[in-house]
Amino acid sequence: MTSAATSSDAVHARAPGKINVSLTVGALQEDGYHDVATAYQAVSLYEDVYATRSDGFSVEFGGSIDTSRLTTGGDNLAIRAARLLARSTGHRGGVHLRIEKDVPIAGGMGGGSADAAATLLACDTLWGTERTRDQLLALGAELGADVPFALAGGTAIGTGRGDRLSPALAKGTFQWVLAIAEFGVSTPDVYGELDKHRERHAQDIFPAQQIPQVDSGVLQALRAGDPHMLAEVLHNDLQAPALHLAPGLGEVLQLGEENGALAGIVSGSGPTVAFLASDLDSALELQIALSAARLQVIRATGPVHGARIITG
């Protein structure tokens, strides 16, 4: 993550989407939230933010995916990011943002968080506000749990709400094939379904961890750069509730594994399904097979860098 020391007239910043290769959800807290422990991997689907000076704050969208249902008002996460940076630095002036989106919307891959991360970095450069890495990460955490990771990128362990990051070593490149649903799944609904499941089956299952942790096998597989090892330990506590709310995802998981995927996992709260392939050739074959089944499919690799300035 880098920023310029002097202001510019226009800035282009880019931030990646993510896959949660492991996600363990702790018990429901009194404040209504859950602590989590997750292994994030940034993947090669990007949000490109073009920032230009303006008197006010505005945003428009383009890109490879349908953005018609996105809000362009003040509650948009990118607008909130720009306003937060301006407020925290005392900057007077606004910004117009043009965001080219390639990360699926409401797909559990952190597209909105990537928008916010790239906006923070773009506006910091545009305005010459010279925030440090730690300052940008802290601002990101105010905006959402996944925003700090979109700034940092690579592979990392997230704890707390997912915003307390520690880097994790990942060797080599992992090949992912992503099946994109034509619908979104509400993150609060998925967490709510998880809580209801745990309450219904409290006598039959182990209680949720108060302080969740990422399994050591996940860290070992990432360090080894071994997709076969990683396939054995992919884990998501939100997968079962997501499948309950969207049963068709189970058929997608089965289809991918029948066509050569080492394993499949619902990414985050879904509904994107991420399939891990053994190598590039296997990923291409899987992409063709899933496309033939009339699924919307994207191939991506990870890990990749976090938010960075492209021009400006």
UniProtKB/Swiss-Prot annotation:
Pfam families noted in UniProt: GHMP_kinases_C (PF08544), GHMP_kinases_N (PF00288)
Pathway noted in the entry: Isoprenoid biosynthesis; isopentenyl diphosphate biosynthesis via DXP pathway; isopentenyl diphosphate from 1-deoxy-D-xylulose 5-phosphate: step 3/6
Binding site for ATP: P104, I105, A106, G107, G108, M109, G110, G111, G112, S113, A114
Enzyme class: transferase
Gene3D superfamilies named in the record: 3.30.230.10, GHMP kinase, C-terminal domain (3.30.70.890)
One example of a Gene Ontology biological process annotation: isopentenyl diphosphate biosynthetic process, methylerythritol 4-phosphate pathway
UniProt xrefs under PANTHER family: 4-DIPHOSPHOCYTIDYL-2-C-METHYL-D-ERYTHRITOL KINASE, CHLOROPLASTIC
Cited function: Catalyzes the phosphorylation of the position 2 hydroxy group of 4-diphosphocytidyl-2C-methyl-D-erythritol.
Descriptive protein name: 4-diphosphocytidyl-2-C-methyl-D-erythritol kinase
Lineage: Bacteria, Bacillati, Actinomycetota, Actinomycetes, Micrococcales
